[in-house]
């Protein structure tokens, strides 16, 4: 099937080039110009056939195509035979027509691409659109980069505007920050636990240096079609198909990345009595050897270690960065030895009493010390109905997501964590406590990483190869729940003109960012890369392929309309100047000026092709 998809991808790209050149051909014939040749590709002809006065060719270099119209250059045979003639004097020639007719012919190619895009988007719309993961186009945040979280963007927030445009998902946040080197966001903190509150933030952000700014929220569903690994910490949790993970250690969870972050943060989930009220906090667990401990407290810690039945050196024990008395009351905080290398957030207050650690009730500081050596998580799953699991229209999906919580029941279940009698079931919610997560490698087979290692070993750069191999090894040790969490599908079907507008806007912003130096050419693709993209689209189904065909067709139109010599837009600019100035063009001067631009364009396409090939063969 891969070969078939590759052939379909190559044919799709060839079709878009064909349509572009066909637009020029039909327009030229319509205004009475004489067309000499019609070629798909440049260089020596692999196939040629003359039909009437036009020679049709397929060139050896698949970088585009051209329509050769009589009299387009000074080397035309009629000019060579008569030195007094100019390109303007050739009957049926390109320059024999008025500037506006020439502009019509030049614009016909990009216009044909725009019509193809509109047609592709129209078919997509009237066939029902595409089925996409909810996370891909939601305005709800599933995870936020730490720099954005510090500015107030949190998982679960809803974004309305991104850099002045209506927000359409995390891909928009990435592209906007890539092109503008900043993010200006407006949205709201939805009413999950309290009243909804508006927010806005404006922060510099460069994804080339900082990575992905945010991810979309996901439903985190256990579908049941993929069984749990035998060594999964949740193997005996009694999960059923359609169960959704909604809460973990005191927080609503909105994405797999957020779940992984909570699992790997080395924090304990504490139930606290504070001034007669129950509060929950997540507090860092710190190695005792990293804290400023007096000799007296070291001896106290060793006594507590003995009482808790813990072996090993006291410095290798995890503890909370506080002095806690035998009844579990917080007496004071303990500072780090080296504050330059790390910092701590202190969430406990003087007089707080710790009554449970990771959902397990405690009676003494020895119980606390014993339990903070490992991290057990408390989880709440929501039993989703068949109606809630059905495919929704993307426009209604965000509201359905926010409305899917019964916060009264959820808060009652969550508030019971650490009580002697927990509320294990209430309504559609079920509490699962004392789950012991494990390193990934202790749950799954290491053979699953062999493919990633093989890809990393292909890198020619030794430093880059070592980086990726080390990253694979570190990922093995990441703490995991051992559960495949899937997203809910939504029907994504914007109107054709909306897709057209977004595509044109993105293309123009990309050109602007390239020209200003904010965007590196490494983010671009040439013919090989476009075929790979179309190959991926075909492999995902006809709707996805239609979407990419429309998008690439729009990009071809925008590219050709750029006011750069040798492109359609450059010639249009010359014709406009001729029309305004009422003076004929100096073709000798123009042809000399075109040479460096032609060389630069060829070098640019060669660079993109080599870059695409390196992605294929190196990674």
Curated annotation (Swiss-Prot):
Membrane topology value: Multi-pass membrane protein
CDD domains reported in the protein's UniProt record: S2P-M50_PDZ_RseP-like
Stored InterPro entries: Pept_M50_Zn (IPR004387), Peptidase_M50 (IPR008915)
Pfam families: Peptidase_M50
GO biological process assignments: proteolysis
Binding site for Zn(2+): 20, 24
EC number: 3.4.24.-
Active site residues of this protein: 21
GO cellular component: plasma membrane
Segments crossing the lipid bilayer: 103-125, 558-580, 593-610
Primary subcellular site in the record, as a coarse category: membrane
Family classification: Belongs to the peptidase M50B family.
Protein name: Putative zinc metalloprotease TC_0344
Organism lineage string: Bacteria, Pseudomonadati, Chlamydiota, Chlamydiia, Chlamydiales
